[in-house]
Amino acid sequence: MAGNKSVVYHGTRDLRVETVPYPKLEHNNRKLEHAVILKVVSTNICGSDQHIYRGRFIVPKGHVLGHEITGEVVEKGSDVELMDIGDLVSVPFNVACGRCRNCKEARSDVCENNLVNPDADLGAFGFDLKGWSGGQAEYVLVPYADYMLLKFGDKEQAMEKIKDLTLISDILPTGFHGCVSAGVKPGSHVYIAGAGPVGRCAAAGARLLGAACVIVGDQNPERLKLLSDAGFETIDLRNSAPLRDQIDQILGKPEVDCGVDAVGFEAHGLGDEANTETPNGALNSLFDVVRAGGAIGIPGIYVGSDPDPVNKDAGSGRLHLDFGKMWTKSIRIMTGMAPVTNYNRHLTEAILWDQMPYLSKVMNIEVITLDQAPDGYAKFDKGSPAKFVIDPHGMLKNK
């Protein structure tokens, strides 16, 4: 193979589709017999990619982006035993070895082993997190294949539902993890901050877990409409009424059992401050509306270094939080990236057995080509309600 057409980062809001070298079964001059090379079937644009696009999460120029990957095995190393050429697989966005203490304790989100970047406590494709090239490309290298990859047993069946299954590499497990972290269970009342793709997946996950009422708040009316059309409760955060009052109008009480932050550090304020970036906004609003003894899951990304912060403290990841309120209410919180391997198999079965028929409606997937990827990023940046799925080889045309 001569080359590999890919989405390449060249600076803030500057992405280019270029041909980079075809991947080899090696990384940083180290042979990887436990790796495979995939022909990418689908690869999605994520909200996390938008942090990079907007210059808020640093990656080096020339880096290939993308961490939501589904692909077909076209080459494998001699140590790969469970995957065969031609297998259709989903790739967790966490790069994890399956061998270290954290992986063995079901914490693949913070694998200790792949120490390419000594400053990172985790590995992921497409970020500057231990140097792994991204999957918004025609082909991609995946290490630790036997541990990492989820193989679809019935390839034809999986391709029929590929627009849903493409979500299990990241955002569906991420949203679901936020709900699990928040203790969502049958009968729960849930408030989700953010109606972007992760927030919508969190809403879908909360319903799958049996929540009685799922409320999603956002400033984007088009994204909120996707949720309301699927039967979820929504709150337009541009409304000047206090969030507690708006929740009270829905539930008859101003607090919920469980909260999910699906926004992260680029959050905005409420009401008159809806157009103002407020890094602590989502978290403080959750501290306010989650009941005493409740819990909050925080899959939204927060960073230790922001190149373009709204204030000095935010630039180093220090936020002004209502910690006293959270402590007094004894709210349990859990942060961090989702350990995708804990959830992807179960969520795949839920999709294949039609337990999430509302997923396609709320996600509003739009399939695009690799060449259209920079335009997809620009539309997403402007608030598009679509979830953009890149189809590098034209394999999703009739799906």
Swiss-Prot record:
InterPro entries hit by this protein: ADH-like_N, ADH_Zn_CS, GroES-like_sf, NAD(P)-bd_dom_sf
Binding site residues for Zn(2+) 2: 97, 100, 103, 111
UniProtKB keywords: Metal-binding, NAD, Nucleotide-binding, Oxidoreductase, Zinc
Principal EC category: oxidoreductase
Keyword Nucleotide-binding applies: yes
Gene3D superfamilies: Medium-chain alcohol dehydrogenases, catalytic domain, NAD(P)-binding Rossmann-like Domain
Gene Ontology terms, MF aspect: formaldehyde dismutase activity; nucleotide binding; zinc ion binding
Binding site for NAD(+): 47-51, 174, 197-198, 218-219, 223, 263, 268, 299-301, 336-338
Activity regulation (UniProt): Inhibited by the substrate analog pyrazole but not by NAD analogs such as AMP, ADP, ATP or N-methylnicotinamide chloride.
Cofactor binding annotation: Binds 2 Zn(2+) ions per subunit.
Domain of life from the UniProt record: Bacteria
Binding-site positions, Zn(2+) 1: 46, 67, 170, 177
Required co-factors: Zn(2+); NAD(+); NADH
Enzyme Commission code: 1.2.98.1
Reactions listed under catalytic activity: 2 formaldehyde + H2O = methanol + formate + H(+)
Family stated for the protein in its record: Belongs to the zinc-containing alcohol dehydrogenase family.
Protein purpose: Active against a range of primary alcohols as well as some secondary alcohols. Exhibits higher activity against alcohols with longer carbon chains.
Subunit annotation: Homotetramer.
Protein name: Formaldehyde dismutase
Taxonomic lineage of the native organism: Bacteria, Pseudomonadati, Pseudomonadota, Gammaproteobacteria, Pseudomonadales
Annotated gene: fdm
